[in-house]
Regions:
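Interface amphipathic segments
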Residues: 1-219
Length: 219
């Protein structure tokens, strides 16, 4: 569930296009399941089920939101026993049915156990920063990752560092580039993966260059 303190004002009602929100969240405690319930109350997309994520983890949340409902600046920080994260973004078209909800912002994590969140033992503590632009039409979101910098990522038992990436993900294709300058792994990968919804045929186009790889050190 969720519990905490929310303070704020809303002006401009009943004119939704001119309605402004100014709110702060302090010492808010929630689980992933509670976050899904909370988001469901504010979006037009119906019930959002996040119960399969971060099972058994409670997050402490502080944040703020300010602006028009369809152009809102939001900041949030999360702290938990599995790491922390901060995000700052502009949310657009929240109440316009003819347009997909949009997000344009930045995300930072510190020692965040991604494996605990998504339910896998392959990846764990991760420290990164990235810019993200996303649209959420019906079906699959369209996501653009700008200047992802991974300072540290525990992946399959090895602690990687020095990773940079950019990419775009949509329902039909992924196109991205990854550069790794880890002490035990130096490589460049650039590739496109496209899936035809009509024929279920996949198209792979990629380029890879491995300068150095110490497999013994990484296993």
């Amino acid at each position: 569930g969720y519990s905490g303190t929310v303070n704020g004002t809303m002006t401009g009602l009943p004119d939704i296009d001119r309605t402004r929100l100014d709110a702060t969240v302090k010492d808010f405690q929630l689980t992933a399941e509670g976050l899904g319930l909370f988001v469901s109350e504010w979006t037009r997309e119906g019930k959002v089920d996040l119960s399969r994520f971060a099972k058994g983890t409670t997050f402490m949340v502080d944040g703020s939101a300010e602006g028009l409902l369809n152009s809102m600046n939001a900041k949030i920080s999360l702290n938990s026993l599995i790491g922390s994260a901060e995000a700052e973004a502009v949310l657009t078209d929240i109440t316009i049915p003819s347009k997909p909800i949009g997000i344009d912002g930045t995300i930072n994590t510190k020692d965040l156990d991604l494996g605990r969140i998504i339910g896998t033992d392959i990846i764990h503590q991760t420290t990164l920063r990235t810019g993200v632009k996303a649209k959420f039409p019906e079906g699959f979101p369209e996501v653009a990752i700008d200047s992802l910098i991974v300072e540290q990522m525990m992946l399959n038992g090895y602690d990687y560092s020095g990773i940079a990436a950019v990419g775009k993900l949509s329902e039909k294709a992924f196109d991205g580039r990854i550069i790794c300058n880890d002490p035990n792994l130096n490589f460049l990968f650039q590739g496109t993966f496209a899936l035809s919804t009509k024929t279920n045929n996949a198209l792979y186009q990629f380029y890879a260059n491995i300068g150095h790889a110490d497999l013994q050190a990484m296993n």
